[in-house]
Regions:
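NAD(P)+-binding Rossmann beta1-loop-alpha1 motif at the extreme N-terminus of oxidoreductases
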Residues: 1-50
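Residues at the C-termini of beta-strands that transition into short coil/loop
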Residues: 35, 68, 107, 129, ...
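Short, charged/polar "capping" segments at the starts of alpha-helices
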Residues: 40-43, 113, 160
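Active-site-adjacent segment of FAD-dependent monooxygenases/related oxidoreductases
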Residues: 54-58, 155
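Rossmann-like NAD(P)(H) cofactor-binding subdomain of soluble oxidoreductases
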Residues: 58-141
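Internal alpha-helical scaffold of NAD(P)-dependent oxidoreductase catalytic cores
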Residues: 96, 119-124, 137-139, 143-190
Length: 190
């Protein structure tokens, strides 16, 4: 997984989804943002994602869509949508996942992974948490407040090959990702 061939969908292109997706795409990872906010999606596709703040103000080319059926299969899904939209959002992307697609949630709060597991299966879900911060300034425009680490780990504990591969790939593509032995504990530390 530690190469540019990894295909990543970001489900929920709000402030944090755009931050993660934009940083990864900026260094060449194959990323697609998925969101229902059409004006936002259109602006990103027309002019690129405008990212201000840490790292300097810039435009990042990253494709976005409101119709995930056009994407083809993905290797990983970063879940960043609002909790109230989680179930319908996951159901809307069933056609882009395969038996090896991995899901990781960096949403605030607890319990999201259990919902994701109930829809896609236990073995597909890994835990995640982040200290990154971002906010939306307008359609296609975010503020990146700092370069801070994020953590992933097997939801029930441990660091496996897939955790190490994803952490290494994301870190090599502009998004510091640390493999965590106990990602649930890391969430509570946040």
């Amino acid at each position: 997984m530690n190469n540019k061939d990894l295909k990543v969908a970001v489900l929920g292109a709000g402030a944090m989804g755009c931050l993660f997706g934009g940083l990864l795409a900026e260094k060449g990872l194959n990323v697609m943002l998925i969101d229902v906010w059409k004006e936002h999606v259109d602006e990103i596709n027309k002019n690129g994602l405008k990212m201000d703040g840490h790292g300097g103000d810039r435009f990042i080319k990253v494709p976005a869509t409101s119709d995930p059926s056009s994407m083809g299969k993905v290797d990983a899904v970063i879940v960043m949508c609002k909790a109230t939209a989680l179930e319908p959002a996951l159901k809307s992307i069933k056609n882009i996942i395969n038996d090896k697609t991995v899901f990781m949630s960096f949403q605030n709060g607890i319990g999201h992974e259990a919902i994701i597991k109930s829809i896609v299966g236990d073995e597909k879900v890994i835990g995640g948490t982040t200290t990154q911060a971002s906010n939306i300034l307008g359609p296609g425009h975010i503020m990146n407040h700092a370069a801070l680490p994020s953590w992933i780990g097997e939801y029930d504990g441990g660091i496996t090959d897939r955790i190490t591969e994803i952490a290494d790939t994301f870190t090599a593509h502009n998004l510091e990702m640390i493999a965590a032995e106990d990602v649930k504990k890391r969430k509570w530390m946040k």
